[in-house]
């Protein structure tokens, strides 16, 4: 194992280009940027935790949700892809029983005493709660872990809908899994991370984000048994036909402060399920739901009913998207993407926040996408939890420059990313 200074020198000399190319592609400009990024992270680790320490470097990807918007937490299907935007973590094991994490862009150094397992007052919604919760998740499955020091640098924008939280969680879990040889599978690590986000961080998320970051590629997941989801991995290079590009636009509206809005979607769906004596909509017969519509409107209210309709339709649509990918029928897939986007407006109602109708960045981005892509073979939809954050668009090459320019004229330079998908999940790179 090399020291941080030794690794920095090796990276800048190109000794680790093959490992970097496996994650980010072999484009020389991309490799040059990643060399500089990794070298800077190693330098920052030394600044905060001292020189001469033997370190390892980890990467955990963000994800683009391809289908299954707000279906995973109801025992439904999910479809997502890992992307090359990722979190990089430089880590060294320690022996004092503390975890110390410094993240680029945040002033605070997280210091977690592993002897204190319970959620701490005032810690929820902060990264320290995720670290503490992940540690407890390892212990809950009988794994012995200890402390480490880490510096992280993330290209997954916070609150952007690319799941920066899952990338951070999987980065932390990967460090423990490697440094302490716990031997857990990617799916098991994802479950621990979801537990931390639900129980310690206080966000009632599903499991799709963590699974995608853990496994990589394109994954189709069946959450009928959320404890043991059934996972199919599709090769990422099978998504886009020649000349088609996946763009994600950051509308510069973070949903990091919208936990209550996300929670309401899950709560309302489960309120409808409870009328049938079930905890999740995935356990409710769809025909019975439609037969009970008059009673459900009275008991649960119309928004809850509409969100339940969204669940049933989006779930069927996600299965159809998977089948279209297997059959390499991109036009069918694209049509389903547009249907999903329409459902977010009409049924799930998570494109904008009703408490702040003045700000509707997602709506503007979707309207602009429709104006440019309507009539083409492209498609567009909101992605992620909603209310703010990002949209995605499948853009034909002949329209890419026009689309990119128009989007950035509205949302600013650097707001539109042309994403590359990634086969690898969270991994030790060096």
Q: Which residues does each PLM region occupy?
A:
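C-terminal nucleotide
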Residues: 1-63, 67, 88, 92-124, ...
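A short glycine/serine-rich beta->alpha loop
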Residues: 53-54, 70-77, 116-124, 154-162, ...
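Glycine/serine-rich anion-binding loops at beta->alpha junctions
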Residues: 59-64, 68-75, 155-172, 376-394
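Structural signature of FAD isoalloxazine-binding scaffolds in flavoprotein oxidoreductases
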Residues: 76-96, 215
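Beta-strand segments within the central parallel beta-sheet cores of soluble alpha/beta enzyme folds
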Residues: 100-102, 147-154, 183-195, 334-339, ...
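Glycine- and acidic-rich phosphate- and metal-coordinating loops
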Residues: 135-157
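Phosphate-handling active-site elements
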Residues: 140-148, 175-192, 397-410
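Fold-level recognition of mixed alpha/beta catalytic cores in primary-metabolism enzymes, strongest
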Residues: 160-248, 430
